[in-house]
UniProtKB/Swiss-Prot annotation:
Chief location bin: cytoplasm
Top-rank taxon: Bacteria
Cellular localisation: Cytoplasm
Gene Ontology terms: biological process: DNA-templated transcription initiation; negative regulation of secondary metabolite biosynthetic process; positive regulation of chemotaxis; positive regulation of single-species biofilm formation on inanimate substrate; regulation of cell motility; regulation of cellular response to heat; regulation of cellular response to oxidative stress; regulation of DNA-templated transcription
Function recorded in the entry: Sigma factors are initiation factors that promote the attachment of RNA polymerase to specific initiation sites and are then released. This sigma factor is the master transcriptional regulator of the stationary phase and the general stress response.
PROSITE patterns recorded: SIGMA70_1 (PS00715), SIGMA70_2 (PS00716)
Protein name as annotated: RNA polymerase sigma factor RpoS
Gene3D superfamilies: RNA Polymerase Primary Sigma Factor, Winged helix-like DNA-binding domain superfamily/Winged helix DNA-binding domain
Record-linked InterPro entries: RNA_pol_sigma-70_dom, RNA_pol_sigma70, RNA_pol_sigma70_r1_2, RNA_pol_sigma70_r2, RNA_pol_sigma70_r3, RNA_pol_sigma70_r4, RNA_pol_sigma_r2, RNA_pol_sigma_r3/r4-like
The gene coding this protein: rpoS
Source lineage: Bacteria, Pseudomonadati, Pseudomonadota, Gammaproteobacteria, Pseudomonadales
DNA-binding positions: 293-312
Cellular component GO terms held in the UniProt record: cytoplasm
Region of interest (Disordered), ranges: 21-50
Keyword field: Cytoplasm, DNA-binding, Sigma factor, Transcription, Transcription regulation
Length: 334
């Protein structure tokens, strides 16, 4: 099948971020198309001098290198797009690869809209690329519309989902995330129209929703901080270390706990080595964590059933020790 090599035609919705190979990205030129007269020779000439202009210690280096690399992937004409989409639909790896590589700049264009939302640009691009791959897998070229229009929805969805999941401590169900995005989009729309941040009442009026429901949904967007987070890069203390325990502690209870611990240690000495080892590991004594029968067996080299038998023997022996000392075993073995 002969393919035309004419330049691609895009409508407004099909615009992509065009980046000439080897050209540095800045805010003023990021969305400009490359000159059709650019030649590999000019690119090579720039390459020989680029070390004078790029500071490789900057965090943007990786992003710039990625953008330069994807600039070598040519865009597809409408005819080529249909051709390679059909190949991808049939499971052809080459067709799938060409569809993905030719639309990587579309992902960058969309990802840049979500900068300063909690994820770096590279992370946003990575998530968007997952959406692009999904779009290639689901796209039907016989439907008659351009791939970029179809892929935009998948790319935006994966990016927005990643922002919601990765920037919050508590993850929300996906249906709640989708509903919350409706409220957040309404808030952004009102922010552009008004001279102030919209109130829940204004958002409720726009969406025709109850004010209480708007407040509830927006409350889900509040950041939650872990109490284990460090107070600073040079500090070993966490937020938990600065919180006071408001629960009253009875000194008598502390003494009773200490006495009980000493008594248990004494009683354990009257068990056999195997019995003592099983009880300590099963019930989390002497600094160990509680373990299952199978875990204890793996740790001491016995079968699960043998560990169970030793545990039964050990507990029976402990009850006898308690009764001999005039104590009830009920409280200890509840």
């Amino acid at each position: 099948m002969a393919l035309k090599k004419e330049g691609p035609e895009f409508d407004h919705d099909d615009e992509v971020l065009l980046l000439e190979p080897g050209i540095m990205l800045d805010e003023s030129s990021a969305d400009e198309q490359p000159s059709p007269r650019a030649t590999p020779k000019a690119t090579t000439s720039f390459s020989s001098k680029q070390h004078k202009h790029i500071d490789y210690t900057r965090a943007l280096d990786a992003t710039q290198l990625y953008l330069n690399e994807i600039g070598f992937s040519p865009l597809l004409t409408p005819e080529e797009e249909v051709h390679f989409a059909r190949l991808a639909q049939k499971g052809d790896p080459a067709g799938r690869k060409r569809m993905i590589e030719s639309n990587l700049r579309l992902v960058v264009k969309i990802a840049r809209r979500y900068v300063n939302r909690g994820l770096s640009l590279l992370d946003l691009i990575e998530e968007g690329n997952l959406g692009l791959i999904r779009a290639v897998e689901k796209f039907d070229p016989e439907r008659g519309f351009r791939f970029s229009t179809y892929a935009t929805w998948w790319i935006r969805q994966t990016i927005e989902r990643a922002i919601m999941n990765q920037t919050r401590t508590i993850r929300l169900p996906i249906h709640v995330v989708k509903e919350l995005n409706v409220y957040l989009r309404a808030a952004r729309e009102l922010t552009h129209k008004l001279d102030h941040e919209p109130s829940p009442e204004e958002i409720a009026n726009l969406l025709e929703k109850p004010v209480a429901e708007v407040k509830r949904m927006l409350g889900l967007n509040e950041r939650v901080t872990s109490v284990d987070v460090s107070l600073g890069p040079d500090s070993d203390k966490t937020l938990l270390d600065t919180l006071t325990d408001d629960r009253p502690t009875d000194p008598c209870e502390l003494l009773q706990d200490d006495d009980l611990s000493e008594s248990i240690d004494q009683w354990l000495t009257e068990l056999t080595d195997k019995q003592r080892e099983v009880v300590i590991r099963r019930f989390g004594l002497r600094g160990h964590e509680s373990s299952t029968l199978e875990e204890v067996g793996q740790e001491i080299g016995l079968t699960r059933e043998r560990v169970r038998q030793i545990q039964v023997e050990a507990l029976k022996r402990l009850r006898e020790i308690l009764e001999k000392n005039g104590l009830s075993s009920d409280a200890l073995f509840q």
